[in-house]
Amino acid sequence: MSTKPSLSSADVSADAQPGATEKAEGTAVTAIANEDQIAEFSASPQRWWGLLVLAVGLGMIVLDGTIVGVSLPTIISELGLDIVGAQWITTIYSAVFAALLLTSGRAGDRFGRRTLFLVGLVIFTGGSVVAALSTSLAPLVIARVIQGIGGACILPSTLSSVNALFRDKDRATAFGIWGAVMSGAAAVGPLLGGVLTQFAGWEAIFWVNVPIAVVLFLLALRWVPNTAGETNGAGGFDVLGLLLSGIGFGAVVFGIIQGAKIGFAFPSAPVVTLLVGAVVLVAFVLWENRRRKNADPALLDVSMFSYATFSWGNTTAMLVAVGEFALVFVLPLYLVS
C-alpha cells in the first residue's frame, strides 16, 4: 500500500467516513478512522510526530502531579494555609485522576481517543487558568479537581492511541518512549517547579500549561488520527461503577487527609468516612464482577487480578507511588523549615 507524502490525521478521519467531502470536513474532528486508514498512517513518517504530541501531553499531566510539591512552601506562605490545606492541593489532583481513569478509558473507546485527548486538554487548561488565578484554598482545590479530570482524560487516550497507531517493532519503540516520558516527567516536575517558583512565582507552574496545551490541541488535529475501541455489550455505560469508584476513592482520601488533623478515634468523621469508603469500594468490586459475568461493559475486569503478574505488578507500582509522592510532599516542607 502506498503512502501519501503529507497525510494528516484530519485526512485520515475524513477519508474514513463515506459520503460527500463537505460532510467529512464538518465531522473531521470527531470522525473515527477505519483500519485501512490507520494502517496507512502507521506506515507514514508522520506517525512519529503524532507520538511526539501524545508524549508531550502525557508529560504535561504527569509533571503536574509533582511540580506543585516544591512550590508548596511559597503557596502556604502567600495564601495563609495550614498543612491539611496543602495536602488537599497535592492529593486531590491524584485522587480525582485515579478515580476517573477507568471511566475515561472506556469513554475513549466509545467516542474516540483523540476526541477524549482534545477534551482533556481543554479541561486541563481551564483548571490551570483557575489555579493560577486563585487567591485562597477553595478555588485552588477546585482547580486541582478540574485538572485531575482533564488529566484522567489525557493519559488513557495517549496509551490507547499509541497501541492503535503503531505496528510490530514500532509499537515496542513507541511504548518505550511513552514509558520513559511518564517516568522522566515525574522526575523533572520538582526541578521545574523550583525554577518557575523562584523566578516567576508559584502561579507560573500553572500558567506554563496554557500555551503548551493550546499548541498540542492544534497539532493533535493535524497529526493524531481519531481511533476507537470495541464497545460490545448490551449493558450500556457503567454509570453505577463510575459513582461507586468515585465515592469510594474520594471517601478514603478524605478520611486519610482529615485524620491527620482531627485524629482517628472512633467515631470521628475520618474513621467513619474511611469505613464508608471501604464498604463502597467492596460494593464496586462486587458490581464490576457481576457485570463481567453478564458480559456487560465493566470499568474494571476484576478477573485480571487472578494473574499473579498483574496483581504483584500493580501492588509494586502502588508502593512505589506512595513512597514517591510522600517524599515529594514532605521533603520541600522539611528543607524549608
Task: For the regions a language model picked out, list residue spans one by one.
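Hydrophobic/aromatic residues within the transmembrane alpha-helices of Major Facilitator Superfamily
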Residues: V56-L63, I92-A95, A99, G126, ...
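12-transmembrane solute porter fold
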Residues: R47-L63, V68-V70, L79, I89, ...
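Helix-loop-helix hairpins in multi-pass membrane proteins, especially solute transporters
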Residues: T103-S245, P267
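Cytosolic juxtamembrane N-terminal segment immediately preceding the first transmembrane helix
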Residues: S2-L63, S77
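Interfacial helix-cap and linker-helix signal at transmembrane-aqueous boundaries
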Residues: I75-I76, A107-G108, L192-A200, I256, ...
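Extracellular/periplasmic helix-loop-helix junction of adjacent transmembrane segments
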Residues: S71-L100, L137-I142
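C-terminal membrane-cytosol helix-exit motif in multi-pass small-molecule transporters
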Residues: R171, P211-G229, G246-Q258, V276-R292
